[in-house]
Amino acid sequence: MIKSVLKVFGTQNDRIVKSYMKRVSNINVLESTYEPMSDEELQVAFNALRESVKSGEKSMEDVLYDSFAITREASKRVLGLRHYDVQMVGGMVLHDGNIAEMKTGEGKTLVATLAVVLNAMTGKGVHVVTVNDYLAKRDSSEMGELYNFLGYSVGCITADIQDDAGRKAQYDADITYGTNNEYGFDYLRDNMKVRLEEKVQREHNYAIVDEVDSILIDEARTPLIISGPTQRDQNHYARADAIAKQMERGEKIETKPGEDEKTTGDFIVDEKNRTIVMTEQGLQKAQDLFEVDNLYSLENAVLSHHLDQALKAHNIFEKDVDYVVQDNEIIIVDEFTGRLSEGRRYSEGLHQALEAKEGVEIQEESQTLAEITYQNYFRLYNKLAGMTGTAQTEATEFSQIYGLDVISIPTNVPVERADRNDLIYNTEKEKLDAVVRKVKEYHSKGQPVLIGTASIEKSEMIHERLKKEKIPHNILNAKNHAQEAEIIKNAGQKGAVTVATNMAGRGVDIKIDDEVRSLGGLAILGTERHESRRIDNQLRGRSGRQGDLGESQFFLSLDDNLLRIFGGEKIRNIMNRLGVEEGEYIDSKIVTRSVEKAQKKVENQHYESRKHILEYDDVANHQRKAIYAFRNQLLDPEFDIDAKIKENRAEYVHHMLAEAEIFEGMPKEDFDIEKLAALIKEELRIEVDPQYFKDKETEELEAMITEMMENIYEEKMSQLEPAQRNEIERILYLQVLDPQWRDHLYEMDVLKTGIGLRGYNQKDPLTEYKQDSYKLFTDLVERIKLEAVKVLHLVQFDFTSPEEEEEAIEQIREELESEVADASLNQSFEEGVIAEDSEKLKPITGTKKPKRNDPCPCGSGKKYKNCCGQSGPKKGLLA
């Protein structure tokens, strides 16, 4: 019934596409206007449109049809490619700030040019986001010819552009291509800069995200982090690892309804959620081994955390599946692409736990200096759009998190690929034997085959079997991806057999010739279902581009993780009832539906996880926005810093009276004026006779102290030129703000790590986190204000010449910039992307400056930040 109704009325997507198609006719009629024009005439016509939008005379909507028509005509002349009508629909979907779902080979790169050209008319910049440097360089170069013809400048941000001036030049272009991590890290670095002119990014106007599902869904659990070393006890990791090895893995025992849950062993592994649950027996054993009474008490939170990570390292994370050991290092394997993510480290001590497990050198844990998730970074843009071949399965998440609707664009030519039912075997061995038999069948007639695997381990197993059968083949996994694009490009040639993990080169088309078409096209064999239907669809989509012939089929076994964890018993029962013998398989739509149901369960779990991360990051995001906004004000020479200092000074005086226990409404005879005078001497180095404050009301005391501070401050500042005064005030304020913000981020990390334990007390961890983080933030703001006033009050100048003055200012600037450069060495990701080469931005330094929490080199026994590193006296400028 539902199907027949849909045939008559169509789906909502059909109706949306139909409405766009009606608008395409308005573009097509303009072809006869622009086609006869010379190149110069076409460029003049376009410039007139561009100027009308930039000046505000017309809106982008007013010129959309003409812009699209001119872009198509220019593309025909420059690239030799004419946009299809369905590509025009895709361009309008992107312009409207939505996601265009387009099948492999439908020309997404060309579609993007329509929306890019139109939106670049505002002069505010357009960012095109790709998944790797190769695609950013390729697309900016190929499409750049079209943009240049229309008078636009094109930039490309890649990891090899190291200097700020070079990166700024790329961002200043009308259109900029780059990877998601380059854009994100530049944003974080910009908000650590000490001069406004050093910032490289412009405003976040409009972005088109290519492979949007990979970046906004798969990597949404991936906070971009700039970090620095922290002072943590490295012995915790080895100790936790030793204890984890003594703990025995148990399991839940089935009990009758109403009976208490029973378990064996010291801990249970929850494979669905990838967590460890300690049993009562295990808790007691761990407490005995750690020699503590309560492992979950606040003072032992670090021990319980490290033990949990050590147990995860030994029981959940697998070598050659989740990570590899190379050159005495743990290197993460990206779960979605299969690539080695060199330079990326797990956070919260998990990476150190894996290092302890594998017996490699345990590297120092890091402290967060700046952080943002992709979710919150991309929500900075005034308008966001995306394109991919697979988005409908995550349409709800795109809508709820990013406000993006997914519109499926029809193919220009109908898809001819045959997608066959899954074949399900009892065991892994039977399945792999069947895959090899099928490969031999295809290979014997020359039909190319692409075999998709979910891990390095599985691709190596297939590789060994094919080698044994003497079938020539290419293998592409995290251990061998240098020639990735070339191997994938050639996977459609006659007789080619290619084994690839999920990395199978997105953005690189597999083309086939007429001979291969006559053999049936490219055959896709999946060796197991991925947790996400999208990844399976991406593998299928490698075949059948632009109406080519092709086929796809998945080979599964009850040993596969997805079936074993999510619903394998149900399928096993079906197989037992059918009496499936060894080597036989089930080819059933019922079973295929059961597999898809299991995938939906996992997808929902991942969605909840991403939503959970966003809920926590939203709390930090409000704080980050407030600090960054104020920081930007401090960088602006036009900002009235004197008014801010005056406002903060009043708060400082109020705080000082409170410290002296003098409050409004108290009888003045109860005022401890001796304590107040002592505080003023200690904090501000001003000698005051306590009798000076005798018999004064609170308001009078505030006015007197404020006047004293103002007089001293103005007398000191009067020797400076207004511009120098402004710069010194801004730089010193930054010198207070930045370290305080970094310490706050560390406190937030500690809070987040332990907040889950509040659930044991029947409290909602998220609510608790919001309350505690708000308290931390209000304390931070208070500390920044008070510390800034104190530093500015205590600063003394002993310049003998303008040159010495400028040298002293430059000295502080360089120190702040050195901290930023140092931090740039420590870019990392919590769970999912390749970090940059840490040597790139390495500053040239002499003697290494002590970190804030290091012991002071003067030998006082105090921490550096509480001794010679205080925001107080400095040679030349501060005394």
From Swiss-Prot:
It catalyses: ATP + H2O + cellular proteinSide 1 = ADP + phosphate + cellular proteinSide 2. Its main location: membrane. Zn(2+) binds at residues 856, 858, 867-868. It holds the Pfam family SecA_SW. May bind 1 zinc ion per subunit. Residues 834-879 are annotated as: Disordered. Part of the Sec protein translocase complex. Interacts with the SecYEG preprotein conducting channel. Has a central role in coupling the hydrolysis of ATP to the transfer of proteins into and across the cell membrane, serving as an ATP-driven molecular motor driving the stepwise translocation of polypeptide chains across the membrane. This is Protein translocase subunit SecA. It comes from Sulfurovum sp. (strain NBC37-1). The gene is secA.
